Curated annotation (Swiss-Prot):
Organism: Helicobacter pylori (strain P12)
InterPro entries noted in UniProt: ATP_synth_B-like_membr_sf, ATP_synth_b/b'su_bac/chlpt
Lineage of the organism: Bacteria, Pseudomonadati, Campylobacterota, Epsilonproteobacteria, Campylobacterales
Family indicated by similarity: Belongs to the ATPase B chain family.
Locations listed in the record: Cell inner membrane
Membrane topology: Single-pass membrane protein
Protein name (Swiss-Prot/TrEMBL): ATP synthase subunit b
Function, as annotated: F(1)F(0) ATP synthase produces ATP from ADP in the presence of a proton or sodium gradient. F-type ATPases consist of two structural domains, F(1) containing the extramembraneous catalytic core and F(0) containing the membrane proton channel, linked together by a central stalk and a peripheral stalk. During catalysis, ATP synthesis in the catalytic domain of F(1) is coupled via a rotary mechanism of the central stalk subunits to proton translocation. Component of the F(0) channel, it forms part of the peripheral stalk, linking F(1) to F(0).
Keywords, in A-Z order: ATP synthesis, Cell inner membrane, Cell membrane, CF(0), Hydrogen ion transport, Ion transport, Membrane, Transmembrane, Transmembrane helix, Transport
Gene name tied to this protein: atpF
Length: 171
């Protein structure tokens, strides 16, 4: 089949020479063309099987390599899916950890705010109690100093019952 195509192609190439009207009777173009075709046919006969086997082996090598690459691609896609799934799980876990940390921080903040509020209230109560004690102490000292001054002045005379009544009313 190939030889027939080659001969037809050669004849088509020579057709313009025939149409020009040149005298080719003195040339040996036909003999050379036949020798060339014969040479190509013999080469084809001896090399066709080797060429076909070579091309088949190359195509088999290419197909094997393609299959290997496709297998690697499939493994890579599976690994990618697996890693993406792990990434999503890690993101979910991170969000859970963050939300737990926020809740715990809020709880701790509330606890310390409550404790601080209670401490402040206790300090205020203690301060008021200390102030009340100091006021009573100052009143008592003032009353004692006034009574002491009055007793020492001897202008006013008090008995013990009068002192007790006055102290009860003022303190």
């Amino acid at each position: 089949m190939f030889v027939v195509k080659m001969v037809l192609g050669f004849l088509i190439l020579l057709s313009p020479l025939c149409a020009t009207g040149l005298d080719i009777s003195q040339t040996d173009i036909i003999e050379r063309s036949l020798n060339f075709l014969l040479f190509v046919g013999i080469l084809w006969y001896f090399l066709a099987k080797k060429l076909r086997s070579f091309l088949r082996s190359k195509s088999l090598e290419i197909s094997k390599r393609l299959e290997e690459i496709q297998a690697q691609l499939k493994v890579s896609k599976e690994n990618k899916k697996k890693l993406l799934k792990e990434l999503e799980q890690a993101k979910e876990k991170a969000e859970l950890i963050i939300s737990d940390a926020n809740k715990e921080a809020y709880t701790i903040t509330q606890k310390y705010e409550l404790q601080t509020k209670m401490d402040v209230e206790n300090l205020i109560k203690n301060s008021k109690a200390l102030m009340d004690l100091e006021v009573k102490k100052i009143k008592r000292e003032l009353v004692e100093s006034v009574f002491k001054d009055l007793r020492e002045s001897k202008k006013v005379s008090f008995n013990a019952q009068d002192c007790v009544n006055i102290l009860k009313q003022r303190l």
